């Protein structure tokens, strides 16, 4: 089992490096096309991107089983919302990897009759559902942390009789701001933004997870035709997300838990 864990970790690191290189090629290809580079060079970059994509699919063989194991562990979480979001996310990831394995079989020639377009659309749908669950989980954790921070700030204000740390009352769980009108609404919004910034600054793993999932969201949206972003945006978002994923491998404390 230890040997499998080490092998899986190595495969995961290689897959993320390949992913970063793939989206870097996508971004580079878009830049070359925009600046009128030679067709031969553009073709070579596209071929390299395709080879990296196929290599990633090979490295992801068996990831469905890992995702199912993660879903089984998430079922035992005590928080109902986290249990639902994380379990559904892992189940969709398992289905995404299963579709990806079928695609690999088709692209590698093992199953030449596979309808690659149909399976690609299926895989991106499952990928999109997984990301939606991840972002829902992030939003839930942010809300909980904002409520905790607001309550702590209110307690400090009652003890000191003044404004502490630049965050005034009025956040979730706070005493609120009397009155109405546009100035009060703008002030409440400003306080919420400051509170959000403080929460994210104090929880780097959550901040990285939000940015990574938000960047990844553009990929299935573009591939499914729900929001055409273009290869440049997809390449940039994929590259940023890949770098953040590699960072969580290098610094495990930056990985959001559970």
Curated annotation (Swiss-Prot):
Subcellular location: Peroxisome membrane
Key word Membrane present: yes
Bilayer topology annotation: Single-pass membrane protein
Intrachain S-S bonds: none
Keywords of this entry: Acetylation, Membrane, Peroxisome, Peroxisome biogenesis, Transmembrane, Transmembrane helix
N6-acetyllysine PTM sites in chain numbering: 43
Region of interest (Interaction with PEX19, PEX11G and FIS1 and peroxisome targeting), residue spans: 210-258
Gene Ontology biological-process entries: peroxisome fission
TM regions (residue ranges): 232-254
Coiled coil: none
GO cellular component terms listed in the entry, alphabetical order: peroxisomal membrane
Pfam families referenced in this protein's UniProt entry, alphabetically: PEX11
Similarity field: Belongs to the peroxin-11 family.
Subunit composition and interactions: Homodimer. Heterodimer with PEX11G. Interacts with PEX19. Interacts with FIS1.
Function: Involved in peroxisomal proliferation. May regulate peroxisome division by recruiting the dynamin-related GTPase DNM1L to the peroxisomal membrane. Promotes membrane protrusion and elongation on the peroxisomal surface.
Protein name: Peroxisomal membrane protein 11B
Gene for this chain: PEX11B
């Amino acid at each position: 089992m230890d040997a499998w864990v080490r092998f899986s970790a190595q495969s995961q690191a290689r897959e993320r490096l390949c992913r970063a290189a793939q989206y870097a090629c996508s971004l580079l290809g878009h830049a070359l096309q925009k600046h009128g580079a030679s067709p031969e060079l553009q073709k070579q970059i596209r071929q390299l991107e395709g080879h990296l994509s196929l290599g990633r699919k090979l490295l992801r063989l068996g990831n469905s089983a890992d995702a199912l194991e993660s879903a089984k562990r998430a079922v035992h979480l005590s928080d109902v919302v986290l249990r639902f979001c994380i379990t559904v996310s892992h189940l969709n990831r398992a289905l995404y990897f299963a579709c990806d394995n079928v695609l690999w079989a088709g692209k590698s020639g093992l199953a030449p009759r596979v309808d690659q377009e149909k399976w690609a659309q299926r895989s991106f749908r499952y990928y999109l559902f997984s990301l939606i669950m991840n972002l829902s989980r992030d939003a839930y954790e942010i809300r909980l942390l904002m409520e905790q921070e607001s309550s702590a700030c209110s307690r400090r204000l009652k003890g000191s009789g003044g404004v502490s740390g630049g965050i005034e009352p009025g956040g979730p769980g706070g005493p609120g701001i009397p009155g109405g009108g546009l100035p009060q609404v703008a002030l409440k919004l400003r306080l919420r933004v400051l509170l959000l910034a403080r929460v994210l600054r104090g929880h780097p793993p959550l901040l990285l997870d939000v940015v990574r999932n938000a960047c990844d969201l553009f990929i299935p949206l573009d591939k499914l035709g729900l929001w055409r972003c273009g290869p440049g945006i997809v390449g940039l978002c994929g590259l940023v997300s890949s770098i953040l994923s590699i960072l969580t491998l290098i610094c495990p404390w930056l990985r959001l838990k559970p």
